[in-house]
């Protein structure tokens, strides 16, 4: 069976068993700061297992894309050198959230693996492990499934602590945990290795193909296991591993998925396909790089972007080892899309973007790779011992962009190692320098803990009423706030929008008899809305009912800008491509700021096109439609979701212009697109690697911006004695006239310099038979002094010249030495001395050099150095 057929068979099997087929989640974990990348099928269901989230189903099956590179789970250094390590892999999984448990999970696994309708694996080739004390699982395998005791192994606490075992899974030191049972495939006696638990278990004969985790306990801080009321199941089977078994090969790189990628890699590099480790590295890395880029990661020097950069650069370096000339890595994307694009349509949609990002990164690395390798060669030539010091590793990282694992790769090939601890010390020193130069603010929301939810009334209007359910002062819960005190008010319901999704929080006031609380900002802590402000009059206490009034004009102006960001997002994807994804936004009453993924500056004509598209949608005055629906229905309708944003089962879908813009959004918006009035882009630029930013204004602010531009145009027309209609012609004529005058001025300067040269040549002095000329000429720039030195060299025939002067409040210096003297006297050496004397720097060729400085008071002393320089040099 081909890998694609195995994937589909697995998902279909569990659908027949009542499971809901759930799409793979993004490689960027949603709202989980503990994870760098999605690395297991259960990641997207974590809150379901913790009981924090309810879904419409209790059984699920997925084929989850996973990356293990960087962070706790890092397979990068082993990739290419072993049969089964990858940076990217697919994890097939079936999950039960308080539904079925051990018996069904084990029976399902055995049926899928051994039934002639499904994988039809020989039963005698399968071995099973269970946790040492999990008699229930053992009995199911032995008595119900019929696995003989000689092919079953109990695995105890083999990692040095209670419940620390290959067959006991835990989410952390406390929380859900439980035993697991693993299924192994025996590749046969011709391959070295022993069964799990034996001294030879690290061999390749017995390979784990499926792990079934039974979450049946909650571990408390005292280490005691308490049974969970609704035990769950989490399973995982690596697609690449089971494909190797079914395709009768012992290495994942021999399966159909990799055979095509290896061939494409060899073709792009221009080398033979002979199973080289470097070729495997390239074939593996094109998968992780392409999927990461498709999910919105771009190469950078921090976080996920840096891991991506490391993987790309490692692939490029291994391609170069195989003889690649020029950019090759991006050329393999097409083969990957052909292989996996049907199962993961985001690859097809983003193909052009993936290729562009990889090509740009490869070209950027090529500029420093050769130079960095030369530096490394020089350092290795003088190396004492077999360890590359941490400071050298850091220098290659910091100056030449060599990730530490790339240097480690090179070291491995020479039977060397790297001082990773020394490298980390250098990195920490750099981080400390960065911390010292930064200032950090406090997140006051983090101080406020509220075990309550606030109902939002703001979609219907800006007025409402609510009851105070909590008060905070300086982060501590209080029963009341007095007049003049600052604090936080939490209501059971409110019309105030709390800052989220890039939209700022509302301001306004809360009021009751004899009391007024001025709300300066509104934020969120969990489901609670926090009204930050000050008691302007009277006092307030928990339990009081208040009138809540958000500032309507600010809310409306903010709504214009928020709705405009949706139109802009859709227009960007239309003009630039589907690779555009929102990376951040800020929406307030004055303007909008929208950050998005794109690898180059937007051309002026594209900016105009964006404005035209958005304003056309505004003029259509179409209704802005909102709908509450489940997340899967919303996605099926094409609703765009923000990467990294976590959504519940029920979401709010916002549509503008029919299907022109369909996004998931909880913000406040206009009723019709025509309410926006006008859209005008005010700036565009880069904010990070692969991220661009557009700032714009709408409505009255856009009109004010255009009026100001009109006034500037009128003022410019007045200055050139023209009108609005001919100001460009007038300016063009003025610029041309200015160019002519500058040309004439240069000619006059040349004549003046020639005349000055005739006069200066006669002032040269003779030192040890050499003519030396040093002179001060204020008011001439470096270009004029260069021309004059050239002229004087011709007039003197043989000699040393140093000219200097003050131009634009800075010292300008030029030195010249005739060709016959450059063996002993070099203009660059003279310039370094003279420039240093005036507090500056300089240098150049033996016959001509330039420099400058800031201390005009020392200029005469600097010029006097010419004579000393000649006397000492001859």
Swiss-Prot record:
Cofactor(s) listed in the protein's UniProt record: Zn(2+)
Keywords: Aminoacyl-tRNA synthetase, ATP-binding, Cytoplasm, Ligase, Metal-binding, Nucleotide-binding, Protein biosynthesis, RNA-binding, tRNA-binding, Zinc
A GO cellular component entry from the record: cytosol
EC number: 6.1.1.7
Coarse class of the protein's main subcellular location: cytoplasm
Keyword field contains Aminoacyl-tRNA synthetase: yes
Cofactor annotation remark: Binds 1 zinc ion per subunit.
Binding site for Zn(2+): 562, 566, 665, 669
Reactions listed under catalytic activity: tRNA(Ala) + L-alanine + ATP = L-alanyl-tRNA(Ala) + AMP + diphosphate
Enzyme class: ligase
Compartment(s) where it occurs, according to its Swiss-Prot or TrEMBL record: Cytoplasm
Gene Ontology biological process terms, A to Z: alanyl-tRNA aminoacylation; negative regulation of DNA-templated transcription
Molecular function terms from GO: alanine-tRNA ligase activity; aminoacyl-tRNA deacylase activity; ATP binding; tRNA binding; zinc ion binding
Pfam families for the chain: DHHA1, tRNA-synt_2c, tRNA_SAD
Record InterPro entries: aa-tRNA-synth_II/BPL/LPL, Ala-tRNA-lgiase_IIc, Ala-tRNA-ligase_IIc_anticod-bd, Ala-tRNA-synth_IIc_core, Ala-tRNA-synth_IIc_N, Ala-tRNA_ligase, Ala_tRNA_ligase_euk/bac, DHHA1_dom
Protein's UniProt keywords contain Transport: no
Free-text note on domains in this protein's UniProt record: Consists of three domains; the N-terminal catalytic domain, the editing domain and the C-terminal C-Ala domain. The editing domain removes incorrectly charged amino acids, while the C-Ala domain, along with tRNA(Ala), serves as a bridge to cooperatively bring together the editing and aminoacylation centers thus stimulating deacylation of misacylated tRNAs.
Entries under NCBIfam families matching the protein: alaS
Function of the molecule: Catalyzes the attachment of alanine to tRNA(Ala) in a two-step reaction: alanine is first activated by ATP to form Ala-AMP and then transferred to the acceptor end of tRNA(Ala). Also edits incorrectly charged Ser-tRNA(Ala) and Gly-tRNA(Ala) via its editing domain.
Sequence similarity: Belongs to the class-II aminoacyl-tRNA synthetase family.
Name used for this protein in its record: Alanine--tRNA ligase
Species in which this protein is naturally found: Ectopseudomonas mendocina (strain ymp)
Gene: alaS
């Amino acid at each position: 069976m081909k890998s694609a057929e195995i994937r589909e068979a697995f998902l279909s099997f569990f659908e027949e068993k009542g499971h809901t087929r759930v799409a793979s989640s993004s490689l960027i974990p949603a709202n989980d700061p503990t994870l760098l990348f999605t690395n297991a099928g259960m990641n997207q269901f974590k809150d379901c297992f913790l009981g924090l989230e309810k879904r419409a189903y209790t059984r699920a099956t997925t084929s989850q894309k996973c990356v293990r590179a960087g962070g706790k789970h890092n397979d990068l250094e082993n990739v290419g050198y072993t049969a089964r390590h990858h940076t990217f892999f697919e994890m097939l999984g079936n999950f039960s959230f308080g539904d079925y448990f051990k018996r069904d999970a084990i029976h399902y696994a055995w049926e899928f693996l051994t039934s002639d309708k499904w994988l039809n694996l020989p039963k005698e080739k399968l071995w099973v492990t269970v946790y040492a004390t999990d008699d229930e699982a053992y009995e199911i395998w032995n008595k119900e499934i019929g696995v003989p005791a000689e092919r079953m192994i109990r695995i105890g606490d083999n990692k040095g602590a209670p419940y620390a075992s290959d067959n006991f899974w835990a989410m952390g030191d406390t929380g859900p945990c439980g035993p697991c049972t693993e299924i192994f495939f025996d590749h046969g006696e011709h391959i070295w290795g022993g069964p799990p638990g034996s001294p030879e278990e690290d061999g390749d004969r017995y390979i784990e193909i499926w792990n079934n985790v039974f979450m049946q306990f909650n571990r408390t801080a005292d280490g005691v296991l308490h049974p969970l009321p609704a035990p769950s199941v989490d399973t995982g089977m690596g697609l690449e591993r089971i494909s190797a078994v079914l395709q009768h090969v012992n290495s994942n790189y021999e399966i159909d998925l990799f055979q095509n990628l290896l061939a494409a890699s060899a073709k792009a590099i221009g080398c033979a396909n002979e199973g080289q480790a470097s070729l495997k590295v390239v074939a593996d890395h094109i998968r992780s790089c392409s999927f990461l880029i498709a999910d919105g990661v771009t190469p950078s020097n921090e976080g996920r972007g840096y891991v991506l950069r490391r993987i790309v650069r490692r692939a490029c370096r291994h391609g170069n080892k195989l003889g690649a000339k020029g950019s090759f890595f991006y050329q393999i994307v097409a083969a990957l899309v052909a292989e996996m694009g049907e199962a993961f349509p985001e690859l097809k949609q983003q193909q052009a973007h993936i290729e562009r990002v990889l090509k740009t990164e490869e070209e950027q690395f090529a500029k420093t790779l050769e130079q960095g390798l030369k530096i490394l060669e020089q350092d290795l030539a003088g190396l004492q011992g077999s360890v590359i010091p941490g400071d050298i590793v850091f220098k290659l990282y910091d100056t030449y962009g060599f990730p530490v694992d790339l240097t480690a790769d090179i070291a491995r090939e020479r039977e060397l190692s790297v001082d990773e601890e020394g490298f980390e010390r250098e990195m920490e020193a750099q981080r400390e320098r960065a911390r010292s130069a930064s200032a950090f603010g406090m997140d006051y929301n983090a101080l406020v803990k509220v075990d309550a939810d606030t109902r939002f009334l703001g979609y219907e209007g800006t007025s409402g009423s609510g009851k105070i359910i909590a008060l905070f002062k300086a982060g501590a819960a209080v029963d009341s706030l007095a007049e003049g005190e600052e604090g936080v008010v939490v209501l059971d319901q409110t019309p105030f929008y709390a800052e989220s999704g890039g939209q700022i929080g509302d301001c306004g006031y809360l009021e009751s008899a004899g009391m007024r609380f001025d709300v300066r900002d509104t934020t969120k802590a969990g489901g609670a809305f926090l009204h930050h402000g000050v008691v302007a009059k009277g006092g307030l206490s928990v339990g009081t009912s208040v009138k809540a009034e958000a500032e309507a004009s600010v809310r409306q102006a903010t709504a214009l800008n928020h709705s405009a960001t949706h139109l802009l997002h859709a227009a960007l994807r239309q003009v630039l491509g589907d690779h555009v994804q929102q990376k951040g936004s800020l929406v307030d009453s004055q303007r909008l700021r929208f950050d998005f993924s794109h690898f180059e500056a937007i051309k002026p004509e594209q900016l105009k096109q964006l404005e035209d598209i958005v304003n056309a949608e505004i003029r259509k005055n179409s209704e802005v439609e909102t709908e509450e629906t489940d997340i899967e229905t919303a996605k099926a309708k094409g609703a765009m979701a923000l990467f990294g944003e976590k959504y519940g089962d029920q979401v709010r879908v916002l549509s503008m212009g029919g299907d022109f813009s369909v996004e998931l959004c909880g913000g406040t918006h206009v009723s019709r697109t025509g309410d926006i009035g006008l859209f005008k882009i005010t700036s565009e630029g880069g904010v990070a690697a692969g991220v661009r930013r557009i700032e714009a204004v709408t409505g009255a602010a856009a009109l004010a911006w255009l009026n100001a531009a009109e006034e500037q145009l009128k003022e410019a027309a007045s200055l050139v004695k023209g009108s609005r209609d001919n100001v460009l012609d007038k300016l063009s004529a003025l610029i041309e006239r200015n160019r002519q005058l500058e040309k004439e001025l240069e000619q006059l300067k040349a004549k003046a310099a020639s005349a000055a040269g005739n006069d200066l040549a006669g002032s040269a002095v003779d030192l040890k038979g050499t003519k030396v000329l040093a002179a001060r000429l204020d008011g001439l720039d470096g270009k004029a002094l260069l021309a004059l030195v050239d002229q004087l060299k011709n007039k003197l025939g043989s000699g040393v010249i140093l000219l200097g002067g003050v131009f634009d409040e800075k010292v300008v210096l030029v030195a010249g030495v005739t060709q016959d003297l450059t063996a002993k006297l070099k203009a660059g050496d003279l310039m370094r001395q003279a420039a240093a004397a005036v507090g500056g720097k300089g240098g150049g060729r033996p016959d001509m050099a330039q420099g400058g400085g800031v201390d005009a008071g020392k200029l005469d002393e600097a010029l006097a150095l010419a004579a000393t320089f000649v006397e000492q040099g001859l």
